[in-house]
Amino acid sequence: MASIHRPKRGSLAFSPRKRAKSHIPRFRAWPEATGEPKLQSFAGYKVGMTHVIMVDDTKNSLTQGMEISVPVTVIETPAIRVAAIRAYAEDSTGEKAIAEVWAADLDPELKRRIPIPAAGNQAEALENIGKLIEEGRVSDVRAVIYTLPKSLTGVPKKVPDIMESGISARDLGTKFEYSKTILGTLVSVTDVFKNGTLVDTAAITIGKGTQGPVKRWGIQLMKGKHSRQGSLRQVGTLGAFNPSRVSWRVPQMGQMGYHQRTEFNKRILKIGSDGEEVTPEGGFINYGLVRGDYILIKGSVPGPSKRLIRLRDPIRAKKADLGEPNILYISRESKQG
């Protein structure tokens, strides 16, 4: 007799499976500070995938020291601008912003996203945050940053994507002093990350709209005569007679895709400034040409091409720093078949 036990179809880990609130993913935590002061996150736009030939530098790997083919994701990373500094205080309900100061000269495209605060006395606002830090009322200092997609030819938008980034520093005073130096300035990806380091990626996955329970949850098709009674791709039962309600655990049709997903410890294989080094013949499908700064991430990244990808210092770094990888070849063969 066949076994009646089997793994449960689908997973409740990501319930409720509904659309993300925004196309901009969120980081809800920041790693502990190490090294020199810098931003702890960056943002770019997904271009597509290709592959590289590199020397395997994984310790104790069967192919250590040999040439291997590795799939990579290309992310175009134009410079971002620091729009504001924000100070947080912690109370019984969590952290809340208690003071902020905005840069004076911001890009006019930012008005398409948010109403820019009126120009105030920047020196007075900075002095106020400094006093709050001295009084011990500030729990954290973060930076408000935004992207500049108008410089990209593959992303047909001018409206910046605005988000918040943590600042890596050993104490609040150092964080605040560093944030004052970058307020209103452009920050490039090389100021935040370097070749060979690990990062966490966050993005909104490809949206697939409304799908049935077979595709959405992976349940089996009806078998035998049950499939001939008008319900081939439906769940066998919605539940017991009592309790007289349908549990949220029952696999049913609904939204699939367009969810936020965060992946840990993705390795940066290369950071470059010449897009021709990675652009294939005829350009990337659904994107086009890479013209500016870019990074190569080992493996895949959630989301379609042109989707905003956020990068953060690893919050659960387990691997030692492998150093800069030795890349021998980057495939530029046409992706159009």
From Swiss-Prot:
Keywords (A to Z) from UniProt: Ribonucleoprotein, Ribosomal protein, RNA-binding, rRNA-binding
Xref: SUPFAM superfamilies: Translation proteins (SSF50447)
A GO term from the CC aspect: cytosolic large ribosomal subunit
Any one of the GO BP annotations: translation
Keyword Ribonucleoprotein included in the entry's annotation: yes
Chain segments carrying region Disordered: 1-20
Entry-linked PANTHER family: 60S RIBOSOMAL PROTEIN L3-RELATED, LARGE RIBOSOMAL SUBUNIT PROTEIN UL3
Family in the record: Belongs to the universal ribosomal protein uL3 family.
HAMAP family: Ribosomal_uL3_A
Assembly with partners or alone: Part of the 50S ribosomal subunit. Forms a cluster with proteins L14 and L24e.
Name of the protein in its database record: Large ribosomal subunit protein uL3
Chain's gene name: rpl3
